From Swiss-Prot:
This is Acetylglutamate kinase. It comes from Shewanella sp. (strain MR-4). It catalyses: N-acetyl-L-glutamate + ATP = N-acetyl-L-glutamyl 5-phosphate + ADP. Its EC number is 2.7.2.8. Substrate binds at G46, G47, R68, N160. GO terms for molecular function: acetylglutamate kinase activity; ATP binding. Belongs to the acetylglutamate kinase family. ArgB subfamily. It is found in: Cytoplasm. It is an enzyme of class 2 (transferase). GO terms for cellular component: cytoplasm. Keywords: Amino-acid biosynthesis, Arginine biosynthesis, ATP-binding, Cytoplasm, Kinase, Nucleotide-binding, Transferase. The keyword Nucleotide-binding applies.
Length: 260
C-alpha cells in the first residue's frame, strides 16, 4: 500500500469542468495511477460555474487582487456551485473512468481550521491543516477524494476558500506532491514562452514587471508557499495533456517547476 509521501495532490480549475474530453483524459490517467498503487487527491475550483450561477441570479462577480469577493448574500449560490454542481460533475467523470471517489469539501472530517482571510473580501476563508484522519482513511482504501474549497468556521459559518490555497493546505496535511493544473501549460514569459523553472526571487521580479499577474499570481504564490514549506518543487502544468501526469508520477518534470 502507498504511503502518505506518495500522495499526488491535483488541483484542477473551473475551466476543466467545461471540457468533457479534458476531464475524461485526466480521470483515465488518474484511474491508471490509482490502479498502479498511486494515491491521488483532487482539489477543485469552479469559478466559471460560480460566475454563471451568480449572473443567473442577477448578481455581479467582483475580484480583488485576483481573489473572488464573497458577500454574505452570494455564499449560498457559491457553495451550491462549488460543493454541489462542480463537485458532482467531477465525481461523475471519475465514476465513468472506473474510479471510486468520495465527494467532499474542506468542511468535512475536521480536516482544516478556517477563519476570515480579509474583511474586504467578505466570506473568503483562510485555512490551515488540522486533522488528516478522514483523508488518510479514504486514500488508504484506494479511493480518490474530490474536495471542493468550501470550508466552515467553528461557529458554522461557510467560507469560500481559493482553491489553489486549499490544495496547498491539503498537500501540507498529507505530505503530498502538489500539482496545480490549469488550461495553460505552465507559467509563460512576456513572449508567451514556457518558463521551465522559477524560484522566489525570479517570481518576485516577474510580478514586479507585470508578467505574472491576477489568477496566475495567486497560483504561483500558493505553489511557492508549499514548495518552501515542504522543501520540494511544486509543478504548475496543464490538464489538457493528461499524459504529463504520468510523467510527473514517475518523478519527471512537466510544466513550470516552482522551486523552494
Amino acid at each position: 500500500m502507498s504511503t502518505n509521501n506518495s500522495v499526488l495532490v491535483l488541483k484542477v480549475g473551473g475551466a476543466l469542468l467545461q471540457c468533457e474530453m479534458g476531464m475524461a483524459r485526466l480521470m483515465d490517467t488518474a484511474a491508471a495511477m490509482i490502479a498502479d498503487g498511486q494515491q491521488v487527491l483532487m482539489v477543485h475550483g469552479g469559478g466559471c460555474l460560480v460566475d454563471e450561477q451568480l449572473a443567473a441570479n442577477g448578481m455581479e462577480t467582483v475580484k480583488l487582487e485576483g481573489l473572488r469577493v464573497t458577500p454574505p448574500e452570494q455564499m449560498p449560490i457559491i457553495a451550491g456551485a462549488l460543493a454541489g454542481t462542480s463537485n458532482k460533475i467531477l465525481q461523475g467523470a471519475a465514476t465513468k473512468a472506473g474510479i471510486v471517489s468520495v465527494g467532499m469539501s474542506l468542511a468535512d472530517g475536521n480536516t482544516v481550521s478556517a477563519k476570515i482571510k480579509d474583511e474586504r473580501l467578505g466570506l473568503v476563508g483562510e485555512v490551515s491543516p488540522k486533522d488528516a484522519t478522514y483523508l488518510k482513511f479514504i486514500l488508504s482504501q484506494g479511493w480518490m477524494p474530490i474536495c471542493s474549497s468550501i470550508a466552515m468556521m467553528d461557529d458554522g459559518q461557510m467560507l469560500n476558500v481559493n482553491a489553489d490555497q486549499a490544495a496547498t493546505v491539503l498537500a501540507k496535511l498529507v505530505g503530498g506532491k502538489l500539482v496545480l493544473l490549469s488550461d495553460v501549460s505552465g507559467v509563460l514569459d512576456g513572449k508567451g514562452q514556457l518558463i521551465p523553472s522559477l524560484n522566489g526571487k525570479q517570481i518576485a521580479e516577474l510580478v514586479k514587471q507585470g508578467v505574472i499577474e491576477k489568477g496566475m499570481k495567486v497560483k504561483v504564490e500558493a505553489a511557492l508557499e508549499v514548495a518552501q514549506w515542504m522543501g520540494q518543487a511544486v509543478q504548475v502544468a496543464s490538464w489538457r495533456d493528461a499524459s504529463q501526469l504520468v510523467a510527473l508520477a514517475k518523478g519527471e518534470a512537466v510544466g513550470t517547476q516552482i522551486q523552494p
